Regions:
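Small-aliphatic-rich amphipathic alpha-helix that forms the alpha element of a beta-alpha
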Residues: 34-36, 115-165
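Glycine-rich phosphate/pyrophosphate-binding beta-alpha loops
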Residues: 38-44
Length: 221
């Protein structure tokens, strides 16, 4: 299967509502092979990728993930949730609560995702190598019609997650992100974002960019 590079980049957005159909081994190979083609600082390749498709392992991870989500909602996102609930008719509140429901769906159905990837890095404190690799994996999945969703919420309970996955205590391997994969039940689309000119500068911070991009330069049409 082939796909225009821009289509893959523009339409690889979080796809959390998925089917439980297994991901073929060939597709899994393409996901991992694409991941390791990403830039690697000093070509150290200080990354490890752990695939989980065993129902027992997923069942052990699911309650940990849900506890992590509870921690997320009650700490980092609590002010935004409170603000949205206080003003539910505001367009920003409506959009934010849609995100909350979507993220909660992933937690409620964590064990149902047919394939889950865990990315680990070694001495990559900036994430400059591991996250391009994870993004490559997600792009490769998109080309094969497989949806993905990235989360790092396991950071709240790393010891429990590491114990389930058998991550060694020595070696300096640190959890970076978790990505769920599955064939989506919904349609692909371009993720809504603030226009690039609202978050970009030229030559200095707050420097005038010189142009605007009011609409995505690629569309499904």
């Amino acid at each position: 299967m082939t796909m225009d590079a821009l289509e893959a980049m523009y339409t690889t957005r979080a796809m959390r509502r998925i089917k439980t159909d297994p991901i073929p081994e060939l597709v899994q190979k393409k996901i991992l092979d694409a991941a390791i083609r990403a830039p690697s600082g000093g070509n150290t390749q200080g990354w490890r990728f752990l695939l989980v498709d065993d129902s027992g392992v997923k069942a052990d991870l699911a309650p940990i993930y849900r506890k992590c989500m509870d921690s997320l909602w009650s700490t980092i996102y609590k002010p935004r949730i409170d603000a949205a609930e206080a003003n539910p008719e505001d367009p920003e509140s409506i959009e934010f609560m849609k995100l909350v429901r979507s993220a909660s769906y992933l937690g409620d159905h964590f064990e149902d995702y047919p394939l889950i990837l865990f990315g680990f890095s070694q001495f990559d404190t900036s994430g400059g190598s591991i996250f391009p690799a994870i993004w490559n994996a997600m792009l490769a999945a998109r080309v094969e019609g497989v949806g993905s969703a990235l989360t790092s919420v396991f950071q709240f309970r790393l010891d429990e997650m590491n114990e389930v996955l058998g991550v060694p205590e020595k070696g300096g391997w640190k959890f970076s992100a978790c990505v769920t994969f599955g064939y989506p039940t919904g349609r692909w689309g371009v993720a809504p974002r603030r226009p690039a000119h609202e978050v970009s500068y030229r030559n200095s911070w707050d420097g005038e960019l010189g142009f605007e991009i009011p609409e995505p330069l690629w569309s499904m049409e």
